[in-house]
Curated annotation (Swiss-Prot):
NCBIfam families: fabZ, PRK00006.1
Catalytic activity from the UniProt record: a (3R)-hydroxyacyl-[ACP] = a (2E)-enoyl-[ACP] + H2O
GO biological process, one term: lipid A biosynthetic process
Pfam families named in the record: FabA (PF07977)
Gene this protein is translated from: fabZ
EC number: 4.2.1.59
Family of the protein in this entry: Belongs to the thioester dehydratase family. FabZ subfamily.
Cellular location(s): Cytoplasm
Name recorded for this polypeptide: 3-hydroxyacyl-[acyl-carrier-protein] dehydratase FabZ
Keyword Lipid metabolism: yes
Record GO cellular component, one term: membrane
């Protein structure tokens, strides 16, 4: 029995899937995914991230809202790779519940983003999202996207 090769998506293809651009494109690479089920991606955190100028001077910490946005973008990539859209259709970030922050994300960290489908109904898909650094949970949340 042979192991299946990971399905990697590089930044160039990510930019064909998501409308976001610098400084708000927050997924650097997809490491692997299974259509309709789960996706694993990374975001490398540089000291040069624009948010560190004010959050916080002398003590840079990635804002929690950007961690959640990175998870939402990973969710979007999985949605776009899973479904064929009709002209003009998009996936929109529709909701977030039970967000918890467990450790700070700092310059030099590599944040791993894991999203998994938990429920689909009437054009809305619910996901769990977990962001980790070195195996430690930085953030976890339930996320939803809507197809419109």
């Amino acid at each position: 029995m042979s192991e299946q090769q990971p399905k990697v998506i590089e930044s160039k293809e990510i930019m064909t899937l998501l409308p976001h651009r610098y400084p708000f494109l927050l997924v650097d690479r997809v490491l692997d995914f299974k259509e309709g089920e789960w996706l694993k991606a990374i975001k490398n955190i540089s000291v040069n991230e624009p948010c560190f100028t004010g959050h916080f001077p002398g003590e840079p910490i990635l804002p929690g809202v950007l961690i959640l946005e990175a998870l939402a973008q990973a969710m979007g990539i999985l949605a776009f790779k899973t479904h064929e859209l009709k002209g003009g259709e998009l996936f929109y970030f529709a909701g977030i519940d039970e967000a918890r922050f467990k450790r700070p994300v700092l310059p030099g960290d590599q944040m791993e983003l894991n999203v998994q489908v938990i429920k689909k109904r009437r054009g809305i898909t619910a996901f769990t999202g977990v962001a980790t650094v070195n195996g430690e949970i930085a953030c976890e949340a339930k996320l939803m996207c809507a197809r419109r």
